[in-house]
Amino acid sequence: MAVKIRLTRMGKIRAPYYRIVVADARTKRDGRAIEEIGQYDPKQEPSLIRVNSERVAYWLSVGAQPTEPVKALLKVTGDWQRFTGEPAPPPMKTAPPKPDKKALFEAAAKEAAGEPRAEATTSRKRSGKHDKGAETTPAAEAAPDAAASADEPAGGASTAAESQDATTDATPSA
């Protein structure tokens, strides 16, 4: 029976994730596997490659043939060089350790405690129908006009009409 070490595709569309498996050469790409011996995630930075070196060495020793992509992965991990007797490759890149969430939270809390609190940078939204600022402005303008109209009877009629127009213009239209 011809045995191959190859990749089976898992994951979602545009988010591939592969398993390194040992399978019969006649099975489908994602068909039944004899054994899963590793994982490969190309979307992470740096790419995640996990291989069970003991099982890879066993399957290569009994004659399993790796496909080209798997052979490249085994060269990166150094398993292919161990099998063929070649010198070891340079070490793989490793992901930087993630910062401790508790330490980040404490640092942010200390930073926030030292800063003086200020007003919000954006103003509050006004309510849609009743704009208080618009209602008070015409009324404030009407009061001085009414006082002036009491002093001048001839010009008072026109200013009172203007003040009434100003209040009717300021009312919100439904």
From Swiss-Prot:
Biased amino acid composition, Polar residues: 160-174
Disordered, as annotated region: 81-174
Signal peptide: none
One cellular component term from this protein's GO annotations in UniProt: small ribosomal subunit
Biological processes per GO annotation: translation
Basic and acidic residues: compositionally biased ranges: 98-118
Keywords: Ribonucleoprotein, Ribosomal protein
Biased composition (Pro residues): 87-97
Family matches, as HAMAP family: Ribosomal_bS16
Official protein name in the record: Small ribosomal subunit protein bS16
Organism expressing this protein natively: Acidothermus cellulolyticus (strain ATCC 43068 / DSM 8971 / 11B)
